[in-house]
Amino acid sequence: SSAASDVYKRQGGYRGLAMNHEGHDMAKWYASNGFVAVVLKYRMPEGVHTIPLSDAEKAMSVIRGNAAKWNLDANKVGVIGSSAGGHLAASLSTLAADANRPDFAILYYPVISFDNMTTHGGSKKNLLGTDIENKELVDRYSLQKQVDDKTPKTLLLLSDDDQTVPPLNSILYYTALNEHHIPASLYMFPSGGHGWGFRYDFTYYQEVKDLIQKWLTYIKITD
């Protein structure tokens, strides 16, 4: 395949990187299925909220700018993110310049909303820093409010018993996508909690892989 899967991973609430089961392990699987997989080691915000998205946009620009050289289809570049990395992937999908938006997104149990009743407190605190009560920024990074007609097709994967990032985050994002007529699918597994990524011991490990493959075929990224 000439498609490029752009893999961003971060868990730990914009505080650290989970580079294995939510980074390199994912990338290896996508690569084994014909994708060029890129794992982005982006900078932590430390309260400077523009830093992660700036790094993500730069990565997209580099990938698309080298598409011909790397034998990639510049119109099949996707983003994958988990937890806080899912928030970054959704930020790229909604807030980035048009040229840097992905063509599809796969979000695992993402942080979406920064509303206090819904959010993951650590992600909000670490991204916004001293601006944590700034309503304009809270609204900006409540990404269900930023979905528009240019937001890419999205697959959401999560567990009903997630006690870290409330499932309502994904539901809000799916609803916003649906309202804008963006093709979207949401799969909520009955168990698994948070942070399972590509762990072999996740009960629905094989089902996740099957769903991803079928969805990528359905949206015509793969044959």
Task: Kindly label every feature range from the protein language model.
Residues 2-8:
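Short, small-residue-biased leader/transition segments that mark boundaries at the very start
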Residues 58-122, 138:
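Primarily recognizes the serine-hydrolase "nucleophile elbow" in alpha/beta-hydrolase
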Residues 163-172:
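Conserved alpha/beta-hydrolase "acid-adjacent" motif
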Residues 150, 155-158, 162:
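Short beta-strand/loop motif that positions the catalytic acidic residue
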Residues 18-25, 38-74, 199-207:
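Catalytic nucleophile-loop/oxyanion-hole region of alpha/beta-hydrolase
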Residues 171-223:
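C-terminal catalytic histidine-bearing segment of alpha/beta-hydrolase fold enzymes
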Residues 131-146, 151-152:
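Active-site nucleophile elbow and catalytic-triad environment of alpha/beta-hydrolase enzymes
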Residues 11-50, 87, 115, 163, ...:
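Short substrate-entry loop that stabilizes the transition state in hydrolases
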